[in-house]
Amino acid sequence: MTETQTAPLTDTRIMPVIHTLFRRELRLVGGLLRSVTAGDTARAAVVADHLDLVGTVLHHHHTAEDDLLWPLLLERVPDDLAPIVHLMESQHGRVEQLLGDITPLLAHWRRTAAAAERDAMAQLYDELYVALAEHLDAEEQRLLPIAARSMTQQEWERMGEVARAGTPEGQQFVVLGMIAYDGGPEGVALLMHGAPPPVRWLVPRLGTRAYRRHALRVYGTATP
């Protein structure tokens, strides 16, 4: 490589596509919870299962970043990362604090469908959405450009593999459909990058179908 040549940027475009899942689902949670009639434990269980799924996907997404993204960037480009380290840490901390507050309430509400717990959780989820949206915006605007020039494509894709491995058994197509819902054709193409043509054709359709069924059960509509 000559002095005028530079390494190609790593393609990080999939990250904002994945973030659409969290933005949409968490934006809807407050209203979803408040719509559950007090004492309706059957409905509470459906909603709680959905919130558990979204929370699990978010947890593994952040864990993969914490384990594979941050240590590598801090080692390679500490000066580039310095201006945003404290911001990202404080935002992550706030998100984890809210999730920690929600977890015991959700476990109890699943069994009781009590109005007080429902309303407390709805408020916490409203706060979580605001905190997470702020964090995702900062990550996309400030962190991804650093990652694109500091990581190899293999390192970047490894992080995605680790995050996906945490998807609950039997929910892979639902989660794929959640991501594809707002991702559009370009997002679906990024999700399926490198897959054989039959897989690129079939899997997104299975994901869309699975999320439609899931959304009908959770929201009462296939297009929440």
Predicted region positions:
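Small-residue-biased structural context
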Residues: M1-P224
